[in-house]
């Protein structure tokens, strides 16, 4: 049986990172946690009907800052989920942390509730740059807050960093990475800064560092991570042995997952091979009134191959040919022309067992994916 993930979206607080493009309405009044969790559970009850007799293998509580919720709220949520759908005894259960609400006390209690992986959104250790990106400013030194947490004691912790920030130098970016490595987490997410053009803060935050500097940051950062014992297994994810994020791996392998909460997305494979995409209402008010689903649709054959490769090509591993049919229920014959074109343009190499990106394919990933669009 394929793995099944559960993504829980908690899209608060209303003050977020300025570069995010989420379209949630801003609420001046504090939103009732108890009411939102009630609707999360009702949403899960409906979605659980799509996956009869299946067990949850990974849980990811995200949405930028779910740790703004009270401890009692998270405890209640996890307890009630078990009454709706079975959870594997060995499930990986992750929660995201906003740095401003980070505390060892919270991590300690989360562990008691069954959470065994923690993802801390640092973005940068440079306090001025952090405050220029985040609508939630912090007065205390970021590194000091992290050092108060015994990372080695809690083991399964991810530190989330961004490079190529506005006006960031090569030295500043590498210092961020060296600082994160010195804290000895078993997982580091390290991705390039990006902001949508339609974001209200685009003019202020789009003055990124020079492309040549970004390339140097990437090359030197990759060497630094490798030298420090971190293996790259996805475009922006690096881990020590046995500490890959199983939830994200399932996602990038084109596995199934339920998505509950405002603006959450899910993907479910039916017994007949049809694959359903679920999209929840991004209007928080409507969601809180019980209108959970915005749209459910079956992914067409044409789009299935594109979505499969969009996900799988993010992983730093060969794509086994048998997996294409396993996850899409489509014969490899259906994409023979696209594969042939990708090989001819030196984006992919093909063996009897797998396809693998060439260095050119990695460098021109968007061009490779365009082959599956036409």
From Swiss-Prot:
<dbReference type="InterPro" id="IPR004559">
    <property type="entry name" value="HemW-like"/>
</dbReference>
<feature type="domain" description="Radical SAM core">
    <location>
        <begin position="1"/>
        <end position="231"/>
    </location>
</feature>
<dbReference type="InterPro" id="IPR006638">
    <property type="entry name" value="Elp3/MiaA/NifB-like_rSAM"/>
</dbReference>
<protein>
    <recommendedName>
        <fullName>Putative heme chaperone HemW-like protein</fullName>
    </recommendedName>
</protein>
<dbReference type="GO" id="GO:0005737">
    <property type="term" value="C:cytoplasm"/>
</dbReference>
<dbReference type="InterPro" id="IPR007197">
    <property type="entry name" value="rSAM"/>
</dbReference>
<comment type="similarity">
    <text>Belongs to the anaerobic coproporphyrinogen-III oxidase family. HemW subfamily.</text>
</comment>
<dbReference type="GO" id="GO:0051539">
    <property type="term" value="F:4 iron, 4 sulfur cluster binding"/>
</dbReference>
<dbReference type="InterPro" id="IPR034505">
    <property type="entry name" value="Coproporphyrinogen-III_oxidase"/>
</dbReference>
<dbReference type="InterPro" id="IPR010723">
    <property type="entry name" value="HemN_C"/>
</dbReference>
<keyword id="KW-0963">Cytoplasm</keyword>
<comment type="function">
    <text>Might be a heme chaperone; in E.coli heme binds independently of binding to [4Fe-4S] or S-adenosyl-L-methionine.</text>
</comment>
<dbReference type="Pfam" id="PF06969">
    <property type="entry name" value="HemN_C"/>
</dbReference>
<dbReference type="GO" id="GO:0006779">
    <property type="term" value="P:porphyrin-containing compound biosynthetic process"/>
</dbReference>
<dbReference type="GO" id="GO:0004109">
    <property type="term" value="F:coproporphyrinogen oxidase activity"/>
</dbReference>
């Amino acid at each position: 049986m394929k793995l099944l993930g559960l993504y829980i979206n908690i899209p608060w607080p209303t003050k977020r990172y300025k570069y995010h493009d989420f379209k949630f309405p801003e609420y001046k009044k504090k939103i009732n946690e108890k009411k939102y969790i009630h609707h999360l559970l009702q949403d899960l009850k409906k979605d659980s009907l799509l996956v009869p007799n299946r067990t949850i293998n990974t849980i990811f509580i995200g949405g930028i800052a779910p740790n703004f919720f009270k401890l009692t709220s998270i405890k209640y949520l996890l307890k009630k989920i078990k009454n709706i759908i079975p959870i594997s005894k060995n499930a990986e259960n992750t929660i995201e942390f906003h740095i401003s609400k980070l505390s060892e006390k919270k991590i300690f209690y989360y562990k008691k509730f069954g959470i065994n992986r923690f993802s801390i959104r640092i973005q940068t250790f440079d306090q001025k740059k952090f405050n220029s990106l985040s609508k939630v400013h912090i007065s205390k030194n970021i590194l000091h807050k992290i050092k108060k947490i015994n990372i080695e004691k809690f083991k399964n912790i991810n530190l989330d960093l961004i490079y190529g920030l506005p006006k960031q130098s090569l030295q500043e970016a590498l210092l961020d990475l060296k600082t994160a490595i010195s804290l000895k987490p078993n997982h580091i997410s390290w991705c390039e800064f990006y902001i949508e053009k339609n974001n209200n803060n685009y003019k202020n935050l789009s003055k990124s560092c020079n492309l040549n500097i970004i390339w140097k940051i990437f090359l030197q950062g990759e060497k630094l991570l490798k030298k420090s014992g971190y293996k790259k297994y996805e475009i922006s994810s690096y881990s020590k042995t046995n500490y890959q994020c199983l939830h994200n791996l399932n996602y990038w392998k084109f596995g199934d997952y339920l998505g509950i909460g405002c603006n959450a997305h899910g993907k479910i494979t039916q017994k007949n091979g049809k694959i359903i995409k679920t999209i929840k209402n991004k209007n928080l008010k409507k969601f809180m009134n019980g209108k959970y689903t915005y749209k459910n649709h079956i992914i067409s054959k044409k789009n299935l191959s594109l979505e499969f490769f969009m996900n799988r090509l993010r992983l730093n591993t060969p794509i086994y040919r048998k997996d294409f049919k396993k996850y899409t229920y489509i014969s490899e014959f259906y994409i023979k022309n696209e594969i042939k074109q990708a090989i001819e343009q030196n984006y992919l190499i093909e063996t009897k067992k797998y396809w693998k990106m060439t260095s050119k394919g990695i460098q021109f990933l968007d061009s490779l994916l365009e082959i599956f669009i036409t």
